[in-house]
Amino acid sequence: MVYKYDFLIIGSGVAGMSYALKVARAHKGKVCMICKTSLDEANTSFAQGGVASVTNLEVDNFDKHIQDTMIAGDYISDYQAVKQVVTMAPEQIKALVQWGVNFDKQQDGKFDLHREGGHSEFRILHHADDTGAEIQRGLMEAVRNCPDIDIKENHFAVEIITQHHLGARVTRRTPYINCYGAYVLNPDTQKVDTYLSKVTVMCTGGCGAVYQTTTNPVIATGDGVDKIGRAVQQECRDRSRMPSSA
């Protein structure tokens, strides 16, 4: 079978579902999400502490948050990446709330902010001590109720489709790689289907399950990074920073 979409998202955690909702609600086209197990099985639901974001501007600001993050990372962190994540955090929190995620609030309606290790101010938004599960719940409900998002549960992305699969020769010296979608295994038919898309996004998370001792679910196998590596024929940048056995 051949399926055609505007957006193909491989992975069903907070990254994959957030991207799906953003493009679908902006009416940018038809979206398909590929989940290798069920939609609710992702590392997102295991996160407990909370989400850091500058919200109380009376005592906090972006510069403080950036500085705290750089210190916590022993100044190894990419400054521009840290700055982007910190400054965009309030907007992302607003989006999560609009999609139905509930964060704990005080009696006056303001967020009940906590402070965790490395933070100089109270800026941790949370939902009791199961913040990840609440984010996963809210996003799943929003995704399932969105008519422009098709969800393929228990489907496994086998390979990214590039010009190599169309007969072109691809090597490490090839200046760029075109992506046309992915080959996906359908467990019901035991056949590999073709999913063509204008945009393909890989949101498959870390590789904690390859270690003997880990708190990660068994699906965290890092196969998404492997698919990208095979497709582009290049070494992945910052592989040592990849989430692993936390």
Functional labels for PLM-detected ranges:
Residues 229-246:
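Positively charged, low-complexity/disordered segments
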Residues 29-30, 35-180, 185-191, 209:
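Conserved N-terminal/central alpha/beta ligand/cofactor-binding core
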Residues 7-33:
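N-terminal Rossmann-like FAD-binding beta1-loop-alpha1 element of flavoenzymes
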